[in-house]
Amino acid sequence: MTINNLLEELNPAQRKAATTDSQNTLVLAGAGSGKTKTIVARAAYLISQGVPAKEIQIVTFTRRAASEIVTRVESHLGLQAEGLRASTFHTFCLSILRRYPKVFDLKGFNVIDRDDQIMMFKLLRGKFEDKRAKEAAAKNSQTSTGKTITFQRKKAAQTVSEILPKPKELVDLYSYSRNTQISLKNALYKQLPGFQPAYNEIKAVMKGYEAQKKERHYLDYDDILEYVARYLNSDDWLLERVTENTKYLLVDEMQDTNPLQWLLLQPFIGRTQLFCVGDDAQSIYGFRGADFENIHSFKERVPDAEVLTLDLNYRSTQEILDLSNWLLDRSELDYKKRLTAHRGEGIKPVLHSFGNEFDEARFIVSDLKKR
């Protein structure tokens, strides 16, 4: 299939986005509006216009999505698309770390995943428990005239499980603080308010985790992002090298980016052609620190950006979209786009309430049998 055939498959709004010549572009893509198809068309269009595929970097949130985009571009352009890069934010940053290790003063490092982090925090909690046990034993024993007198406390001491969050919760708290770029104290208030009295103990555990990583030359996923983001914002030589190889940056699912990822994108503004796609009316990674301001305030942060809208929905009927539009109209945020159904009219949605998920499942099965 030629690029002309691909462009002919797009609707006018998709085609305008795919072929824009703006330096910076934000595409507000409503649900089911062909977002991925538009990104594929954008990459294919750039290559067809003479842009070397190796100068295009696409970043998204899953390896599967990245692989799908590259495969679809290759299906349209064949060998012409060879060298096109699509990856997650972490893989993109990891490639920079490994290509320029001396810049980051990293002579050698090992990447640890979430399971490794959980195990490290589990061991740190164990050390904390041992320390408390020794302190409690010292307090409960007093020596007088060569004899040891043991006093029975009225109330049993809290266990470490009661004082500190679970290892998984500590990992999530640590990551949330890094990704939102807020202090540990504020992250604790937002994520685990019930553990605020243990702030000093949690802070000590976090310091222990940082010390162990440094000692063992470990980098977790948050380190990978923050190392690269910080250095790109402060090291002109590194930024020059990276932007030489990345002249076109396409960002998928912009609404799910967090403050740390925005910090990573900032240095590219003005040096690369930035093309961001996302839905300003949805976000599924709030628990990871996703910040809707990255998309809602994009025009303020990048004043020369062109903002385009994809509002033709290919997934739902108009009755479903009318309900969605009605909800968005009542939001405090200003949503300018209104989704229109390509499929036309349909059945008006009906609200059903259930006592539990099993009743819900039984209803769905019963309803499907009737259709």
Label for each model-derived stretch:
Residues M1-K107, E240, D322-N325:
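P-loop NTPase Walker
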Residues T2, L6-L7, Y45, P259-R362, ...:
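Conserved RecA-like helicase ATPase core segment
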Residues E8-T19, Q23-V27, A65, R85, ...:
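Conserved helicase NTPase motor core
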Residues A17, I39-L46, Q57-F61, A65, ...:
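Structural preference for long, well-ordered alpha-helical segments in enzyme cores
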Residues E55-T60, R64-P165, H352, V365:
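Conserved P-loop NTPase-based nucleic-acid remodeling module centered on helicase motor cores
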Residues A65, I69, T88, Q117-M120, ...:
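Helical mechanochemical/support elements of P-loop NTPase systems and associated helical scaffolds
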Residues H76, R99, V103, K127-K131, ...:
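Phosphate/oxyanion-binding loops and surfaces in catalytic or ligand/nucleic-acid-binding neighborhoods
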Residues I118, K122-Y218, D236, L274, ...:
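Basic/charged alpha-beta structural segments of nucleotide/phosphate-handling enzymes
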